[in-house]
Amino acid sequence: PVAGFWRYASMLPVTKAENRISLGEVVTPLIGLERCAGWLGAAAGKVIVKDEGRLPTGSFLARGLCLAVSMAKELGVEHLAIPTNGNAGAALAAYATRAQIESFVFCPADTPEINVREIAAQGAHVWRVNGLINDCGRIVGEGTNAMGWFNFSTLKEPYRIEGKKTMGLELAEQFDWQPPAVIMYPTGGGTGLIGMWKAFNELKQIGWIRDPLPRMVAVQAAGCAPIVRAYDAGQEEATLWQNAQTVAAGIRVPAAIGDFLILRAVRESNGFATAVEDQAILAAQQEAAMKEGVMLCPEGAATLAAYQQELASGRISGDESVVLFNCATGLKYPLAPVTQELDCT
């Protein structure tokens, strides 16, 4: 059988096998968090992490960019550009190089150095921008005509969602076509949440899964929570979040292009949107590492913090099976210095 998400090729838009770019994608594992039960509280039920950090370039961005670059190859596109907080740029650089397509990447000024170097090392033209991700997106958009590149920003092309859809297809298969009750997803641009909801509806239409479909929970950081604010206010679109700040850079998206699609998926699934403080994110990250040996990225840790928070609030029950998405390996992020030295002289 075909490995990784190309096993679902019949449900994906790439028509020619020779255009299916691959860097050795795998089915990402499900890891139970049994030892975190005491920290989570008495109400804690069965909670599982889907660790997307095992994918090429170390993040779930590999799914969307692999599919989108494959379609770019199929359609004869020669130049691609993307704004990124780090991981999307790394994935684009790797897959574009694999496909022999030129790529241009624009990062906020405070993007971790390891991410910028990774992007450059894999062949992309990369620049730091004095601003946030939306400023980078504006540069990419304005340069489309002048530079002749194709805009690969979130939801500016239709195929990244198709790649992210494979998270839902894969998860359903891993659960023997009976998906979990709740999915908690770190939400910035929200492509993955939208794509998974699309996957579950497609699987339902062909009779592979049945109701109830998973409740989709959009998790954001308290320092950048435009989707949560819009959800709580009953709005269909989100407004720009001013002065966005959080340790979870991947979900620091002040204005998501697909805000209305995120909110629609959350509401259609009877889910909700919630935000957690940075202190809770860091505590969850430490708990998973120290108790379970699971190195969550800050965005993934946000889902664990949110699970604890919503167990206490009652919006999630201990009887519900819950999957938390860890969107990247924690090894790609700066860690606190804890070295102890021993003098052997």
Q: Predicted regions: what is each one?
A:
Residues P1-T345:
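PLP-dependent amino-acid enzyme catalytic core
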